[in-house]
Amino acid sequence: MARLEDPTALTQLPDESARVRYTSSELQDYFETLKFPQRFLDLGNSVLKDPSLARTKENGLPLLQAITRYHTCNVPFENLVLHYDPHKIVTLDPAELYTKIVTRRRGGRCMENNIFLGTALRSLGYEVRNCGGRVSRAMSPYPEVRKNQSATYDGWNHMLLLVFLGDEWYGVDVGMGSMGPNLPFPLQDGFESLSIAPREIRIQKRSISETHATGPSHATKMWCYDVCYNPAESKKTWTPVYCFTETEFLPQDYEVMSWFTSTNPRSFFTRYITCTKMIMDEDKEVIIGNLTLFKDTVRETIGSDRKVVKKFETEEERIKGLVEIFDVNLTEEEKNSLPQEKRLA
C-alpha cells in the first residue's frame, strides 16, 4: 500500500521491473517455514532450477498441492495485527508480508496470505492472477444472520488466486481459515471433491440471488464455491461459502477491501480475536481438521468431531496459548498494545 500520510502516493501495480519477487534463498526459507519433507523440497528445488516446470501439471500441480496443504497447516489464518499491533494497520506489501510470514512465523487474513502466496508462486515460475470474492452470509458468526440472510453475500471482501497449469486455470485459496477448499481446484463448472472428510466442496458457475436482472438469462454468472457437510445424506445440502470472479484485481482494489474489513466496527475481524491452523494426518497427505482460537477458547475439529482444547481465563494464558498451540510469538510491544477492553481478566 502507498504511504498513508501522502495523499499523492497512490497505490498501483508496479511496473514489471519493480515488482517484488522472492529469491531462491527466500523461497527455500519459505519451504522451511512450511516444514516441507524431503520429497517436496526436492520438487521445489527442481522448479527453482527450471521455472518452466511450474506451469506443467506433471511438476507444477503436485508442488502447488503440497504448498497449499502445508501453508494452511503452518501459516495461521489470523487477525492479531488488528488487536495487538500498536498501529492496527494491515500491510499488503509483498516484501513486508515475507518478513511477517517467513521471518516472524506469523500469518494473516485472506489478502495477506494470498498476496504473499501469489508472490511466492510467481517467483517460482507460476502464472498467477489475483482475484476477488464475496463471502456468503451463510458463513456469518451470527445465528440471526445465517437464519435470515444466508442467501445473500457480503460486498467484495475476499481474495483468492487463479493459477494456470497446462491448459486450464485452478483456484487456490490459503486465506479462508477452516472453511477454505484446502486444495487447488480446477475452474470447472460442476467440479466436486472431498475436502476435509466428510466435507465435500463444489464449484458451480451460476447467478446469485441478488440481482437487478429481469430474467435468469440477463443475470451475471459468478463462480460459486459451496460445501456439503454431510454428503452421506440421501439428498446433499450445499451451503455457499463465497462467490468469485475471474476478473483480475489490482493492489488498489485490495487496499479498499482490506481497509474496510480492518476498520469497520461491524467487521468480524475488528471485533474478535481469532487464529486458525489446519491439521494434517500422520502421513502428511491430507488435511483432517483444524485448531481455532476464537476470543478466549481454542477448539479442535477433526472430521465431524469438535472439542474444546483450552479455555483461557487471563490475557497471559491466551498469549501463552498462541505460542504453545499456534507457534505465534508476539513482541512485548504487541502484547502491551491490546486495548484494555479486549483483554481477558
UniProtKB/Swiss-Prot annotation:
Pathway: Xenobiotic degradation. Pfam families: Acetyltransf_2. Disruption phenotype: Eliminates the ability to metabolize BOA. SUPFAM superfamilies: Cysteine proteinases (SSF54001). Disulfide bonds: none annotated. The active site is at residues 110, 158, 173. Fusarium verticillioides possesses 2 unlinked loci, FDB1 and FDB2, necessary for detoxification of antimicrobial compounds produced by maize, including 2-benzoxazolinone (BOA). The FDB2 cluster arose as a duplication of the FDB1 cluster with rearrangement and expansion by incorporating additional genes. This is N-malonyltransferase FDB2. It comes from Gibberella moniliformis. The gene is FDB2.
